[in-house]
Amino acid sequence: MRVGITLACTECKNRNYASIKNKKNNPDRLEVKKYCKFCKSHTAHKETK
């Protein structure tokens, strides 16, 4: 079952990215290092609802 998620920056809390994930393969929250245009650096982005 694939669901839509948003990824929020852990430093400035802005929601920068939208993505989809398979809940069966990844039941826990996703965390990815991505570029944040507000922080102007690569930071960790966590899955939000």
UniProtKB/Swiss-Prot annotation:
Q: Which GO terms describe its biological process?
A: translation
Q: Which InterPro entries match?
A: Ribosomal_bL33 (IPR001705), Ribosomal_bL33_CS (IPR018264), Ribosomal_bL33_sf (IPR038584), Ribosomal_zn-bd (IPR011332)
- Domain of life here? Bacteria
List, alphabetically, the GO terms of the cellular component aspect: cytoplasm; ribonucleoprotein complex; ribosome
Which keywords does this Swiss-Prot/TrEMBL entry list? Ribonucleoprotein, Ribosomal protein
* PANTHER family (alphabetical): 50S RIBOSOMAL PROTEIN L33, CHLOROPLASTIC, LARGE RIBOSOMAL SUBUNIT PROTEIN BL33C
Name the chain's protein: Large ribosomal subunit protein bL33
Name the source organism. Answer: Desulfitobacterium hafniense (strain Y51)
